[in-house]
Amino acid sequence: MGPSLETPEPVEDVLANPLKQKPQLVAPEPEHCPGPESEQAGTADSCAGCPNQAICASAPKGPDPDLPAITARLAGVKHKILVLSGKGGVGKSTLTAQLAQALATNPEATVGVMDTDICGPSIPKMLGVEAETIHVSGSGWSPVWAADNLAVMSIQFMLPNRDDAIIWRGPKKNGLIKQFLKDVEWGDLDFLLVDTPPGTSDEHLSVNTFLKESRIEGAVVVTTPQEVSLLDVRKEIDFCRKAGIRILGLVENMSLFVCPKCTHATEIFQATTGGGRALAAEMGIPFLGAVPLDPRLGMACDYGESFFDSFPDSPACLALKQVVRGLAGQIGLDPKEVVPEG
């Protein structure tokens, strides 16, 4: 008989309380056990004589006491938007950085970026603040300002050496994300973009739980045209629906390569099943646009420079602005006010 996986925990239970750690029991749960994570754990009549009684009775119960503090801290943030992808390497962090810079081209807007890709933080590099550190005051942590109206928070600012690996399990990641939300002086922001790691992991569950009371506006999902990427994006969309996260739209990244010399468009990654636009129609979600592959965008990220300042007329720049305008429309804002024409 081959190896088998344990019966997975119902997804509804995980989403309802992903941060509560199940107590380490010393004996199997008896027949009439109320459940080691229930409010009656260790105190119900059926717990009498159980070897696990003391363990269950001392385990933390009830809602997270820090949630009201998070809600209060983020009271001045108007729109909280997650950026998700089912697969790594599709340009999710790149898109997050470009969305932030596009929104920040409006001098009337104040934008924040929270990097929750704990094990692979790349946002500081892309926004040109990799060498900065966090300043702590009596009222909390100060974010790093990449521009007068663009604030950034990432674990990268806390590393002694920029090449240090972060080898953490879920609880420690959850704790840092909570600190980013509860202890950082975000102040008044028009937009807070949350860059996440690929897939559906502890970081996603934590952010969703911590922001539940202060309301997430929704999520932007990033893909590339090929089916191997779309396959994982379908799972990401399913996660959002089960978690109650509104999908603001799908962005197809690296859709075409437009030659900067002759402007001829070449399909590098073939959309064998119709690409992002077809998937959006299939899943019933908005399609925000397709961003062409432009090596100059990668170069701008490497140097931490604004792609919008360096190549304002490039097809990728124009496409990114259209994505942001489409996103603005989804959250009830005037697209032309969010990213002015020209």
UniProtKB/Swiss-Prot annotation:
Protein residues bound to [4Fe-4S] cluster 1: C33, C47, C50, C56
GO cellular component: cytosol
Annotated SUPFAM superfamilies: P-loop containing nucleoside triphosphate hydrolases (SSF52540)
Sequence segments annotated as region (Disordered): 1-45
UniProt keyword terms in alphabetical order: 4Fe-4S, ATP-binding, Cytoplasm, Iron, Iron-sulfur, Metal-binding, Nucleotide-binding
Binding sites annotated in the UniProt record for [4Fe-4S] cluster 2: C259, C262
Cofactor note: Binds 4 [4Fe-4S] clusters per heterotetramer. Contains two stable clusters in the N-termini of NBP35 and two labile, bridging clusters between subunits of the NBP35-CFD1 heterotetramer.
CDD domains named among the record's database cross-references: Mrp_NBP35 (cd02037)
Origin superkingdom: Eukaryota
UniProt: ATP binding residues: G86, K87, G88, G89, V90, G91, K92, S93
Cofactor(s) this protein requires: [4Fe-4S] cluster
Keyword set includes Ribosomal protein: no
Location relative to the cell: Cytoplasm
Single GO BP term: iron-sulfur cluster assembly
Molecular function as annotated in GO: 4 iron, 4 sulfur cluster binding; ATP binding; ATP-dependent FeS chaperone activity; metal ion binding
Quaternary state and interactors: Heterotetramer of 2 NBP35 and 2 CFD1 chains.
Function: Component of the cytosolic iron-sulfur (Fe/S) protein assembly (CIA) machinery. Required for maturation of extramitochondrial Fe-S proteins. The NBP35-CFD1 heterotetramer forms a Fe-S scaffold complex, mediating the de novo assembly of an Fe-S cluster and its transfer to target apoproteins.
PANTHER family associated with the record: CYTOSOLIC FE-S CLUSTER ASSEMBLY FACTOR NUBP1, NUCLEOTIDE-BINDING PROTEIN NBP35 YEAST -RELATED
Family: Belongs to the Mrp/NBP35 ATP-binding proteins family. NUBP1/NBP35 subfamily.
Protein name as annotated: Cytosolic Fe-S cluster assembly factor NBP35
Organism: Chaetomium globosum (strain ATCC 6205 / CBS 148.51 / DSM 1962 / NBRC 6347 / NRRL 1970)
